[in-house]
A protein has these predicted regions:
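Interhelical loop and adjacent transmembrane-helix boundary motif
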Residues: 13-21, 165-227
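Hydrophobic alpha-helical transmembrane segments of multipass integral membrane proteins
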Residues: 23, 27, 31-43, 47, ...
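Transmembrane-helix boundary motif in ABC transporter permease subunits
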Residues: 34-66, 79, 83-87, 141, ...
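Membrane-interfacial helix termini and adjacent extracytoplasmic/periplasmic loops
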Residues: 2-3, 10, 75-107, 138, ...
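Periplasmic/extracellular loop-to-transmembrane helix junction in inner-membrane transport proteins
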Residues: 1-37, 191-196
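Membrane-helix interface segments
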Residues: 53-62, 91-96, 137, 151-152, ...
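Transmembrane alpha-helices
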Residues: 112-115, 122-124, 137-166
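C-terminal transmembrane helix and the adjacent membrane-cytosol boundary/short C-terminal tail
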Residues: 55-58, 116-127, 131, 137-144, ...
Length: 229
């Protein structure tokens, strides 16, 4: 019975982890989030490095283009990608490509903004110094630049995962009919779903909250240890 407190029970958690429909939805959502985060972080990092080492006008142009998806409402972005991919390019909506592209367009600018400050904090002479010490361009990039900005890359990846999990509007416009993420499933489940499914989703919310708290605590502890060193 919803709304009546009758003591502590793990019944809803059992329902959550034993219902195949919910497990399939959660697994698909996590796989999508990790894939989108990887692509977004890769594109955001490449864009940030290119913007940092490009000329002033080129850097300003990249920064301006990066602001467009952020300033746009998600509904506009989702509908635009739906029209672009499906109507103009003829991509089948039953594939995952429109969804993958849509969420990457949403997340990549935030990954870019996470990496760029780390580049600005870095000594601008490190790259040239690495070249002078015998590194080629690829070695200087991977062994010096990427290591220096790794905290920003990690932050961009985690932020992209969060944005992908949270997104509803872009997912609604671009997802295949047979696929649901946590956000779209929860919205649909509030419209006449069985009581046990609704309560299992409450349990899922508690699990997500606990995982986020543990991740934040772990990252803060790791950062504190680095500062002590």
């Amino acid at each position: 019975m919803i709304g009546a407190i009758r003591g502590f029970s793990l019944e809803h958690y059992v329902t959550l982890f034993t219902t195949k429909e919910l497990l399939h939805m959660i697994g698909g959502t996590l796989l999508l989030a990790v894939t989108v985060a990887f692509l977004s972080t890769l594109l955001g990092t490449i864009g940030a490095i290119g913007s940092f080492y490009a000329g002033k006008k080129s850097g300003q142009c990249i920064n301006f283009l990066n602001q467009i998806p952020i300033a746009n409402a998600e509904v506009v972005t989702g509908f635009s990608i739906c029209v672009l991919m499906i109507v103009l390019f003829g991509v089948d909506k039953d594939t995952y490509l429109p969804l993958l592209v849509g969420q990457t367009v949403l997340c990549a600018p935030f990954a870019y903004l996470s990496v760029l400050p780390k580049l600005k904090q870095m000594d601008p002479n490190l790259y040239e110094a690495a070249l002078d010490l015998g590194c080629n361009h690829r070695q200087a990039l991977w062994r010096v630049i990427v290591r220096e900005i790794m905290p920003g890359i990690t932050s961009g990846f985690m932020l992209s995962v969060t944005l992908s999990l949270d997104d509803y509007f872009i997912t609604t416009y671009t997802k295949p009919a047979v696929f649901d993420t946590i956000s779209t499933y929860v919205v649909n489940a509030t419209k006449g779903a069985r009581t046990e499914i609704k309560t299992a989703l409450w349990a899922l919310s508690a699990v997500i909250f606990l995982v986020v708290v543990l991740v934040v605590i772990g990252m803060n502890m790791k950062a504190g240890r680095r500062q002590k060193r």
